Amino acid sequence: MPLSYQHFRKLLLLDDEAGPLEEELPRLADEGLNHRVAEDLNLGNPNVSIPWTHKVGNFTGLYSSTVPVFNPEWQTPSFPDIHLQEDIVDRCKQFVGPLTVNENRRLKLIMPARFYPNVTKYLPLDKGIKPYYPEHVVNHYFQTRHYLHTLWKAGILYKRESTHSASFCGSPYSWEQDLQHGRLVFQTSKRHGDKSFCPQSPGILPRSSVGPCIQSQLRKSRLGPQPTQGQLAGRPQGGSGSIRARIHPSPWGTVGVEPSGSGHTHICASSSSSCLHQSAVRTAAYSPISTSKGHSSSGHAVELHHFPPNSSRSQSQGSVLSCWWLQFRNSKPCSEYCLSHIVNLIEDWGPCAEHGEHRIRTPRTPARVTGGVFLVDKNPHNTTESRLVVDFSQFSRGNTRVSWPKFAVPNLQSLTNLLSSNLSWLSLDVSAAFYHLPLHPAAMPHLLVGSSGLSRYVARLSSNSRIINHQHGTMQDLHNSCSRNLYVSLMLLYKTYGWKLHLYSHPIILGFRKIPMGVGLSPFLLAQFTSAICSVVRRAFPHCLAFSYMDDVVLGAKSVQHLESLYAAVTNFLLSLGIHLNPNKTKRWGYSLNFMGYVIGSWGTWPQDHIVQNFKLCFRKLPVNRPIDWKVCQRIVGLLGFAAPFTQCGYPALMPLYACIQAKQAFTFSPTYKAFLSKQYMTLYPVARQRPGLCQVFADATPTGWGLAIGHQRMRGTFVSPLPIHTAELLAACFARSRSGANLIGTDNSVVLSRKYTSFPWLLGCAANWILRGTSFVYVPSALNPADDPSRGRLGLYRPLLRLPYRPTTGRTSLYADSPSVPSHLPDRVHFASPLHVAWRPP
């Protein structure tokens, strides 16, 4: 007969009328009993003949995507001019005195951040924007391009101008200026002798081919005088000839063009174009070396133009033939839905490409992307704004995957010890936190996004793909992309974007200048950054509490007035560092703080309400006696695991589910097991703050017996049959708790000390978790453990009771980082009369 829920409760000793603990509890460690119960509850039955269930409520398998909804009305969020101050360390020193080693190390990590994976896969530009919304292809394309353009304008992306140069907006950092080689102007130098120059004037030498060899030439040229190629690498110095170059030929003086797809293009410049007189440079553009490459994977026509810094070339200068959009102007409409109708709507479509305020040399950057992008809702509560999702998952896959650095996240108990207090709280919202942290330009070639331009994008997605050999020469080919759908979409988009339709229809390649969200390194860097800043704030205001997890920063103070003055001081400090706060999203929590999915107050910690609603819903939808796909079980365990510490039996109750997931087997909920779990989760208990104290109760065990020292009293007992040592120690701790009621127990067993009871026999783990809930353990070496003798059956010998103090841990968050001594010449910081009447230190 299957085990009923009532019997099961009794078995786990969750009822009050259980027999004496010393007899009942060791039974739960019995292997036979555990097997019988598992069979009764149908827990370990991997061979299932019925098909698996792949959906439970909102939970589908981990890898099956919930279909995202496209919103044509999405607003692109605006990004403030985010520029984290480069002298952040000095500013912090002014604020709080010398920094600790930890703070220094963490702030250096992000100034600038570096990311150099061993292997980077380059994907064709067509994969730049993911066809995530097949019904709204064109709309999604333009919204994504607009989002990328906004990020570039805000200084978050670099724009690849050529193989070795990029441009960007916003304030440059010193490590970018080091690479700038005189910004847009390349001044030729007279180093290494003049042999290679044309006799008349300083100029640029002809190059027969430009290819990957450029780096080796740059290396060679540092070694001293070189024939012919040496000039290229000289740092700009002296010389008055200044030459400005556009798009593909990099502004660092190469007159060759390297198209992205095909090997090398050999352009031998004629002598007239290679020896340029200074006057000619100032008045005229280059002799027209222009290779119109049709649509290679970068799709740019390459021209060299003389253009003053910051000017965008208007389309009249450019070769109209090279621009897919403007070609429609001169062509006859092919139908009423021809794109030429749209192109003829306005006279000036603006530039084919825009250039940033600053230009910079980069390592070799191919005309490819390394990750795709698409748009989704900003968050479940805000569907009016979009968020850009960047898929750089290539760095987390395969043999060459990058193993991301691990970082400490406080566990629930540490968090409670830290934040559970009678303080008033508020939380700050850092806007676009990831985009605060600058990346070194050398990382740009690994983090490329972009698109191959509208014509390729539309052609690739139309059912009869018409790009054959990438020939877009003839008018017939041009009109192949005209269709009613495209026409209607573009007409609607014209109202939103106007002349920018032309700009966005061109191919573009962008690299990240600040850390992107889709790389495993970013959360680590953000956590290091905010924790260092909070550490500085904590030391500056020792009577308050500042704490952060990723971009979530909370401040606590003893009274509301004090909190407001702290808020003002901290906000000014953060703004002075260049950190952007969103004042509308500052939340004042009163005495119960909402943080990391928990509600934390003076009584302890509790899961937030929406999470409680989630698992109530989950239990309502959970099918009984039907095998559930282990991937769905992963989702269920993820949700239930979050709230497990608040239940009677904790994590051990979920062990059967964990075992199934590890074995990649379907799991079947029996009515009793489901009833047991749902009852566990209907009654939650807060996790309380641990208090410091003096340990008076000690437990110890041998495989055959147990002993306790409670104050001056000693007790001992034996087990019916020998038990594994960890199991025996756990039983001894349970007896100590139930006999003395003490919530501070000394033990010499590291497994009991860790309070992780998932590796014990299942029934014992569940029961022990309930008995030892809220107990703190202190480590006592065996040689000093007063319970050691009783456990070996010797009651007569008394070891003196230890005075073992217990300090609750706050994980790796050091609240008391002692400030390094302040040099005497610094004036004392002004002390304002604190609104605290009592000297108070954080818990």
Curated annotation (Swiss-Prot):
Q: Which domain of life is it from?
A: Viruses
Regulation of catalytic or functional activity = Activated by host HSP70 and HSP40 in vitro to be able to bind the epsilon loop of the pgRNA. Because deletion of the RNase H region renders the protein partly chaperone-independent, the chaperones may be needed indirectly to relieve occlusion of the RNA-binding site by this domain. Inhibited by several reverse-transcriptase inhibitors: Lamivudine, Adefovir and Entecavir.
Q: Which gene carries the instructions for this protein?
A: P
Site Priming of reverse-transcription by covalently linking the first nucleotide of the (-)DNA: give positions: Y63
- Gene Ontology MF term list: DNA binding; DNA-directed DNA polymerase activity; metal ion binding; RNA-directed DNA polymerase activity; RNA-DNA hybrid ribonuclease activity
* Region (Polymerase/reverse transcriptase domain (RT)) residue spans: 347-690
Biased-composition ranges, Polar residues, are: 290-299
What is the name of this protein? Protein P
Q: What does this protein do?
A: Multifunctional enzyme that converts the viral RNA genome into dsDNA in viral cytoplasmic capsids. This enzyme displays a DNA polymerase activity that can copy either DNA or RNA templates, and a ribonuclease H (RNase H) activity that cleaves the RNA strand of RNA-DNA heteroduplexes in a partially processive 3'- to 5'-endonucleasic mode. Neo-synthesized pregenomic RNA (pgRNA) are encapsidated together with the P protein, and reverse-transcribed inside the nucleocapsid.
Q: Per the UniProt entry, what species is this protein from, by scientific name?
A: Hepatitis B virus genotype B1 subtype adw (isolate Japan/pJDW233/1988)
Entry remark concerning the domains of this protein: Terminal protein domain (TP) is hepadnavirus-specific. Spacer domain is highly variable and separates the TP and RT domains. Polymerase/reverse-transcriptase domain (RT) and ribonuclease H domain (RH) are similar to retrovirus reverse transcriptase/RNase H. The polymerase/reverse transcriptase (RT) and ribonuclease H (RH) domains are structured in five subdomains: finger, palm, thumb, connection and RNase H. Within the palm subdomain, the 'primer grip' region is thought to be involved in the positioning of the primer terminus for accommodating the incoming nucleotide. The RH domain stabilizes the association of RT with primer-template.
A GO BP annotation: DNA replication
